[in-house]
Regions:
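Contiguous, well-folded functional domains in the mature portion of proteins
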Residues: 1-185
């Protein structure tokens, strides 16, 4: 009876929020484990069903209304701006080491973890760097953690670099775009 009631709650929640495809895969796995645990140790299965809900919630992908201005630069991530400063371009890019404006956004576990295009334009380059998984809020995380660098160029040939950095909790970066893809902010 509990699994059927839980399934009804899940269907209702899915109808409220769009969920990223990666979330469905992990949700299915966690639900199968939860269901199997019902026959072994039911109290643990209840906890695992609740964890399954968390998986769906973590991978939510809500619709966004972005400005119609093609020259606008929007935040590529939900989160808190934790630093605005001047910094050199990431050394892995071919853009030199001239200082540029850097805006650091920290995403905690309650933020939407689907990143967006900061500008309308074409992906000029994608650079993946394997690394460690320090707490993302530490300064050393931006240099030592796993990261994915996206270089985009708009119609005015201006470049924007967006760096995704993995952390202790969100330990992997999945990119679903390719070089030369045109994106809209």
């Amino acid at each position: 009876t509990f699994p059927l009631m839980f399934a009804g709650v899940i269907i209702f929640l899915i109808s409220l929020e769009k969920v990223h495809k990666e979330g469905y895969r992990l949700f299915t796995i966690s639900m199968l484990i939860s269901f199997g645990m019902e026959f072994v140790f039911q109290p643990l299965s209840i906890f695992l069903y609740i964890f399954s809900l968390f998986v769906l919630w973590f991978f939510r992908d809500p619709e966004r209304n972005t400005p119609l201005d093609n020259d606008a630069v929007i935040s590529p991530a939900d989160g808190t701006i934790c630093k605005i400063d001047q910094a050199p371009m990431p050394k892995e890019t071919s853009l030199g080491n001239e200082a540029c404006l850097r805006v650091c956004i920290f995403m905690n576990v309650v933020n939407v973890h689907v990143n967006r295009a900061p500008i309308s334009g074409i992906i000029d380059d994608i650079i993946y760097i394997a690394g460690k998984f320090f707490v993302a809020s530490l300064d050393k995380a931006s240099e030592h953690n796993e990261r994915n660098i996206l270089v985009m160029q708009n119609k005015k040939n201006e470049k924007i670099v967006s760096v995704q950095i993995a952390g202790l909790v969100a330990r992997r970066i999945l990119s679903f775009v390719e070089k030369s893809t045109s994106l809209k902010a």
